[in-house]
Amino acid sequence: MAKQDFYEILGVPKTAEEREIKKAYKRLAMKFHPDRNQGDKEAEAKFKEIKEAYEILTDAQKRAAYDQYGHAAFEQGGMGGGGYGGGGFGGGGADFGDIFGDVFGDIFGGGRGRQRASRGADLRYNMELTLEEAVRGVTKEIRIPTLEECDICHGSGAKVGTKPQTCPTCHGSGQVQIRQGFFAVQQACPHCHGRGTLIKDPCNKCHGHGRVEKTKTLSVKIPAGVDTGDRIRLAGEGEAGEHGAQAGDLYVQVQVKQHAIFEREGNNLYCEVPINFAMAALGGEIEVPTLDGRVNLKVPGETQTGKLFRMRGRGVKSVRGGAQGDLLCRVVVETPVGLNDKQKQLLKELQESFGGPTGENNSPRSKSFFDGVKKFFDDLTR
């Protein structure tokens, strides 16, 4: 009986792109998967056809050979020659372990069989700091749930007194070679899943995984000068690798809390300093806060609200080295409230001495404003 065309099996045209082929494969594989059709021999046979068509049409070299020679390209020698060497799979059949891995790996993101022991996963920890801690540096203890190397089998997964055995199928390489017509295809060993070893007697504590769940405590040193968004890497403090492989890393993500007085921009600090209008007019000294304590700020006479005063070296020292930032104090002139009769009278006399609200001599910005307003209305009435 002639074999059905691979494109017809998947229901795609011969011009189909790989994306279309994969989409059709996933849909059909789910429909005819043996787990969904237990005991149905026709579904099992259909599933094998779908698998074979998918493997050929998603491999550029195999697809080119098939397009040119048809099924004849893969009929010379069948799947003999390189084989699994005792795996028990016939000349034209496909390894069901590999099929299941492909179907559910492609659909759910797992990919094909595992290749040897893999590196442990990286972990992330979000750490909140006060501004003072971020500026000065701090050492903090944190607790993180993770996977650690089993302390009984030391990551091997094997029972104490035993060792993992070399896989008899792949002879420890983790790979097997299959001949398909003109091609030799290498894939993960279906017996050991690419590790090259088998655990006959698993560890009683980790049950052969080589890792156990645990919450560990770490002391993390935060360098001075860090800011929100900075990330600190602790090499080897992530999850333990599989069966003795390299551990992952831990990344501490820094978030600095909002401060009641200071705002930070880069290595500079900003704060608002309220003063009364008498000091703004006459000048004087006022205490202002810094991260190192109080210092005196000299305010010159005739200071306007919004004026910035820079105190050099009172900011943050860069975590990457270099000069220290500055503290910039923004003056806010406050209008007096809760005045008694005497104070009100004094202010009235002061206002009269200014020559009214426009204050030509003493309030140049006010005069300029009202002159502009007068000109605006004069222009409207012309």
UniProtKB/Swiss-Prot annotation:
Keywords: Chaperone, Cytoplasm, DNA replication, Metal-binding, Repeat, Stress response, Zinc, Zinc-finger. It comes from the Bacteria. PANTHER family: CHAPERONE PROTEIN DNAJ (PTHR43096:SF48), DNAJ HOMOLOG 1, MITOCHONDRIAL-RELATED (PTHR43096). Zn(2+) 2 binds at residues 167, 170, 189, 192. Residues 5-70 form the J domain. Participates actively in the response to hyperosmotic and heat shock by preventing the aggregation of stress-denatured proteins and by disaggregating proteins, also in an autonomous, DnaK-independent fashion. Unfolded proteins bind initially to DnaJ; upon interaction with the DnaJ-bound protein, DnaK hydrolyzes its bound ATP, resulting in the formation of a stable complex. GrpE releases ADP from DnaK; ATP binding to DnaK triggers the release of the substrate protein, thus completing the reaction cycle. Zn(2+) 1 binds at residues 150, 153, 203, 206. CXXCXGXG motif repeats lie at residues 150-157, 167-174, 189-196, 203-210. CDD domains: DnaJ, DnaJ_C, DnaJ_zf. Belongs to the DnaJ family. It is found in: Cytoplasm. The lineage of its organism: Bacteria, Pseudomonadati, Pseudomonadota, Gammaproteobacteria, Enterobacterales. GO terms for cellular component: cytoplasm. Binds 2 Zn(2+) ions per monomer. The J domain is necessary and sufficient to stimulate DnaK ATPase activity. Zinc center 1 plays an important role in the autonomous, DnaK-independent chaperone activity of DnaJ. Zinc center 2 is essential for interaction with DnaK and for DnaJ activity. This is Chaperone protein DnaJ. Homodimer. Transmembrane segments: none annotated.
